[in-house]
Amino acid sequence: MKVVIIGGGAAGMTAASRIKAIKPDWEVTVFEETNFVSHAPCGIPYVVEGISEADHLMYYPPEFFRKERGIDVRINAKVIEVGEGFLRVRQNGRESKYEWDKLLIATGALPKIPNVKGSELDGIVTIRHPANAEKLKRIIDEAKNIVIVGAGYIGVEMAEAVSSLGKKVTVVEFLDQPLPNLDKEIANLVKAEMEKKVDLRLGEKLEAFEGKDRVERVVTNKNSYDCDLAIVATGIRPNVELAKMLGCKLGETGAIWVDEKMQTSVENVYSAGDCVETKHMVTGKKVWIPLAPAANKMGYVAGVNISGGSLEFPGVVGTQLTKFFELEIGSTGLSEKMARSEGFEVRSTVIKAKTRVHYYPGGKDITLKVIADERGRILGAQAVGSEVAMRINVFAVMIQAGFKTKDVFFSDLAYAPPLTPIWDPIIVSARTLKF
């Protein structure tokens, strides 16, 4: 059996490893267009900041997969054509044809490039792939005045990274808040923290990049900002071109449609990772939420099913986490505005608390917002402050399990004065929402 995987990222390498574990005699080939496999794009800002090196964003190098797992990993190998039972690959200037019995498309996502005047100028960069992280760091090191376009997760993380290097940083965002998936009460706390470190310009639409051969300023509908480097962080899109070439159905989100077993609409063709849509476990609707934990699990599920097993991917609740300097930021499930747009009758609460009992030193602030429907079912949670990750993860599990406020209130959470308050913010939120 010949299995071919297009894309050596999280989903692709997880699937390849699972297939070889189950079917060690099968021939598994991975084509990756860069020289990085099993990579962690989420770590790019921390390479830029100098916290890590680009090579460390690979969990294992290609040689590990070849020697230890028997996977034929082809790097710097770009798939240029795919058809029924075959594909064509360009590698080292040569084109070759390969056959497959089963195919996994794990092509990930691509950065969105704004269609504005001057977008072809030098000095305009996107955050795409760990293979380019070291080059990106060198470019940023040479710049002094940087404009970041977009205040989503990538924009916020890059704002921290480059301002930590002593650069002058301006962040331009079309919407009236950073991190648009957050509700206003929580986003305003992020906004206040960002304004201490960078020049944050909200409600401004990008209109053009200007300069001779290299970008010299970013122009919006309200202002223009001089710069010697522009970082574009205006979002990403699913990389679906090869799937379309093969005739795979695209879903309503524009990403590749798959069933719960990661099978596409084409027989013997699977897809996983940031290029596919999945189900939201709160609404039951199809969503495209490209995040690394889901991509890894999708790859695992695809690997099991390609190998003849039976495993279903249940969907996601969209759990996300980041930070801006000392401020941790997390969310899971639906925001209040999302819940209302989905037709839920919403109850919500915002609480401010400490992370320790009052008499023990070291307690820090956390602000938590929890959203429930009229029956008390937890729909979503958001938090900013300290020790956010644990609480958002707890809520993610509660949302998946269908907890109501009463279930949350009676959850037997751990307590110790040096570590947690007796009334954890999670419990207080349920008490405030009532049941």
Feature annotation, model-predicted:
Residues 1-71, 160-182, 390:
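Beta1-alpha1 glycine-rich phosphate/pyrophosphate-binding loop at the start
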Residues 5, 9-13, 35, 109-111, ...:
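Residue-level detector of alpha-helix initiation sites
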Residues 6-10, 14-25, 33-34, 234, ...:
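Flexible, glycine-rich terminal cap/loop adjacent to redox cofactors
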Residues 25-29, 68, 73-93, 98, ...:
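A Rossmann-like FAD-binding core segment of flavoenzymes
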Residues 58, 145, 153-208, 291-294, ...:
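Rossmann-like dinucleotide-binding cores of NAD(P)H-dependent redox enzymes
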Residues 105-165, 200, 258-260:
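Glycine-rich dinucleotide-binding loop and its adjacent helix/turn
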Residues 120-143, 213-217, 224-301, 394:
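FAD-site-proximal beta/loop scaffold in flavoenzymes
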Residues 258, 272-335, 420-435:
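A conserved FAD-binding loop/helix module that cradles the flavin
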